[in-house]
Amino acid sequence: MLRTYQPKKRHRKKVHGFRKRMSTKAGRNVLKRRRLKGRHRLTA
């Protein structure tokens, strides 16, 4: 079986990071929802 998840720190940050979230309206909404929900970790 192939291992499909090959983690890379850079890719994870580039795709799911805080700055990426802040760069779009939808991303800011994601952060807002996670803050309202009380998440300790907002982004990857």
From Swiss-Prot:
Residues 1-44 are annotated as: Disordered. The keyword ATP-binding does not apply. GO terms for biological process: translation. InterPro entries: Ribosomal_bL34. GO terms for molecular function: structural constituent of ribosome. Residues 1-23, 30-44 have a biased composition (Basic residues). Keywords: Ribonucleoprotein, Ribosomal protein. Belongs to the bacterial ribosomal protein bL34 family. This is Large ribosomal subunit protein bL34. It comes from Caldanaerobacter subterraneus subsp. tengcongensis (strain DSM 15242 / JCM 11007 / NBRC 100824 / MB4) (Thermoanaerobacter tengcongensis). The lineage of its organism: Bacteria, Bacillati, Bacillota, Clostridia, Thermoanaerobacterales. The gene is rpmH.
